[in-house]
Amino acid sequence: MANVFEVLERDHQEVKRLMDELEERPRGGADEQERMRQRKNQVRQLIIEESKHEAVEEEYFWPAVRDLVPQGKELAEHAIKQEQQAKYVLNDLIDYEPGVARFEEMLGDFINDAREHIAYEEEQVWPELRLVISPERAMELGTKIQKAKRLAPTRPHPHTPPRPGLLKAAGPFVGAADRIRDLVAARTRH
């Protein structure tokens, strides 16, 4: 079992790893078409990881920050605003192909914003939450987030309001629908 900070840190590390790979833009080896296919797959994986992460944060983490941290409401609202903007970018990114100028511009903007958002969470929010959360509550929250992530949406849903009650009720169904779409999309690519 891991506490909330360990769970979210693992997610952040995975997202940063994917962003690092995308920034490297592989050269040589495979032909150009193969490199673009790999790049599209990396972006799909980034979208999946980021979508699941943000969904469970909105469902569990930000409500805890609001409830426990003295200025938690303001911290959470700022972060959720960043996350909502990212959802719009990721949702639009799905429609473009790698190598196209708009795709690369949007991806670069997303990566810069995502790094800023991760730093905001880790450097401003987490220290405040660590001051007030009990070890038991941190473990409980980590467990809930890990479980919820298994059923979380795998695609961005920018038009869904980031309300915890709505996410708890609809999240598993939206996640299931996303997984079906992911399977169908995978079949049509092969």
Model-derived regions, located:
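Small-residue-biased structural context
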Residues: 1-190
